[in-house]
Regions:
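A short, hydrophobic, proline-anchored segment that marks a local hinge/packing element in signaling
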Residues: 108-118, 126, 261-262
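Regulatory sensory and allosteric helical modules in signal-transduction proteins
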Residues: 54-61, 73-98
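Mobile "lid/hinge" segments at catalytic clefts and subdomain interfaces of large enzymes
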Residues: 118-201
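Extended active-site and interfacial segments that coordinate phosphate-rich ligands
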Residues: 65-79, 113, 125-159, 273-289
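Short, basic/aromatic recognition patches
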Residues: 20-44, 80-84, 96-102
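Accessory "access/gating" subregions that flank catalytic or transport cores
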Residues: 197-277
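Short, small/polar residue-rich loop motifs at catalytic or cofactor-binding pockets
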Residues: 43-47, 107-109
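Glycine- and acidic
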Residues: 8-12, 32, 60-62, 179-181, ...
């Protein structure tokens, strides 16, 4: 890391910020686990919390399930694209469980809170959690997304601090145990508000420029480290293949899983071209997964 590239920070502050954002997402994770109403979140850890730049790039993730890491960032970016930066305000909270945005199933509900400092958008706090019920049928007999349950398009749960009570009513009317759903909703809000509060403490202590440049340095260093490790792998094409017995609907019909990894220099391409086509059962995944 050179001072010319990051004049507002230095290696010491950057390392403090790196550990600081890890601590923030760790506290978000702990608060969610302590306040969630269903065991899928606090026992199975079917959730993820994170901090993201104002462009939606990942700053830090408090991992529950690693499979959400990319989906979280893509979900934040989708919400930014949907509303536009100029239509995102202090007090807003955005929500969706759209499977084609999150890359997952409808039970995974994602809340995103924009973080402002002195009137300027500087980051986002986000929480994806598995609700025990979102309506719909049992997964083992579901063959289309409409059977899975309530679909929540990208929208604002809160607009400039005003909660969308109609949306809450819609959720209550479409789940079997409303108290559980609303309890998990409140737990997720607690998590993202914790992220906002703690991240702003770092910003106020070191200044927004130092925080922004430290985060850029952390990302650059992370990319450099990953590329260095990739260089240690001999150039070539590596392939692996497995299968699932079936998709739960077409019994006995194998579902092939094939992956090809191409390494060239410090770059790696993961090719899923030969993986199975979409199946009738509930094993399909979106690109963000």
């Amino acid at each position: 890391m050179g001072n010319a590239a990051y004049p507002a920070t230095n290696p010491v502050i950057t390392e403090i910020v790196r550990n600081g954002v890890i601590a923030v997402t760790g506290e978000m994770k702990s608060n969610l686990m302590r306040t969630a109403y269903n065991t899928i979140i606090y026992e199975a850890l079917d959730f993820t919390v994170g901090l993201f730049t104002r462009d939606g790039a990942t700053i830090s993730i408090g991992i529950g399930l690693p499979m959400f890491i990319r989906g979280m960032s893509e979900t934040v970016k989708a919400k930014i694209a949907h509303f536009g930066i100029d239509n995102i305000h202090p007090g807003d909270i955005m929500v969706t469980n759209d499977a084609y945005t999150t890359g997952s199933h409808l039970n995974h509900v994602t809340f995103t809170l924009p973080i402002f400092h002195d009137g300027e958008l500087i980051a986002f706090a986000c929480c994806m959690g598995h609700w025990i019920d979102i309506g719909g049928r049992l997964g083992s007999v579901t063959t289309d997304i409409f059977s899975e349950g309530l679909q929540i398009p990208i929208c604002k749960y809160a607009d400039k601090g005003v909660v969308n009570e109609f949306l809450e009513d819609v959720i209550r009317m479409n789940v079997r145990i409303p108290s559980r759903a609303m309890g998990d909703l409140r737990a997720q809000l607690t998590a993202i508000k914790t992220g906002e509060r703690r991240f702003l403490e770092l910003v106020r202590r070191y200044g927004p420029d130092a925080i922004e440049q430290s985060i850029s340095a952390i990302m650059d260093n992370g990319e450099a480290a990953a590329r260095k490790r990739t260089l240690a792998i001999p150039d070539g094409t590596y392939e692996a293949e497995s299968f699932m017995d079936d998709d739960g609907i077409d019994i006995g019909k194998r579902v092939p899983i094939k992956v090809r990894v191409i390494v060239k220099g410090d770059a790696m391409t993961i090719d899923l071209t030969d993986i199975s086509d979409q199946v009738r059962g509930f094993y399909n995944s979106g690109i963000t997964t």
